Every structure is written in structure tokens, then in C-alpha cells.
């Protein structure tokens, strides 16, 4: 299906094992947020946004906010947790 193709193409953008694991961790985090807040996961972050975050590797709120699809509101709401995940995971994998 078109949706499966889109998903496959997105996942092909994740080159390294590190990126693939980080993608899984971010998806897990998104699912928890989704359950806590009662929003569907894609409202919190699309798969594309998760991939873009992984590719950009933002180090602070300013860099995170510049990623297309994040914006000020999402950065304010989820930024701290996203940056924490990125920081913790990069240390673990070095």
C-alpha cells in the first residue's frame, strides 16, 4: 500500500543501528505520551518528524524548534523530554 511504502522509505532514511534504535525509543516515548494525554500518536509527532529529529540531532530548544513540524508549541510541550532522550541515548552509544 501507499502507506507501507511511505513507512518503508522513511525507515530507509535511518542508516545506522544507532538511528534505528533511537527511532524505536522515540516511538515508544510517543506512544506513552499518546496514552497519557489521550491524543493519537501522530498528533504528538509524525514518523517523519521523528526521523527529522534524529537526522538533525538538536542540542537545545532553539535547534529543536527549527525542525519543520516542531514549532514553538511542541517544543515547549515535549522539547525537554525529546532533548533528554537524545542526550542520554548518544552517551550510551558512544
Regions inferred by a protein language model and the residue ranges of each:
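Accessory DNA-binding and partner-docking regions appended to nucleic-acid-acting proteins
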Residues: 1-94
Amino acid at each position: 500500500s501507499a502507506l507501507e511504502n511511505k513507512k518503508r522509505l522513511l525507515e530507509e532514511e535511518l542508516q545506522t543501528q544507532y538511528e534505528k534504535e533511537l527511532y524505536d525509543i522515540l516511538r515508544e516515548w510517543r506512544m506513552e505520551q499518546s496514552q497519557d494525554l489521550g491524543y493519537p500518536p501522530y498528533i504528538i509527532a509524525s514518523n517523519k518528524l521523528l526521523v527529522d529529529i534524529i537526522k538533525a540531532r538538536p542540542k537545545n530548544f532553539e535547534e529543536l524548534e527549527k525542525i519543520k513540524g516542531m514549532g514553538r508549541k511542541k517544543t515547549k510541550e515535549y522539547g525537554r523530554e525529546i532533548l533528554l532522550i537524545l542526550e542520554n541515548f548518544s552517551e550510551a552509544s558512544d
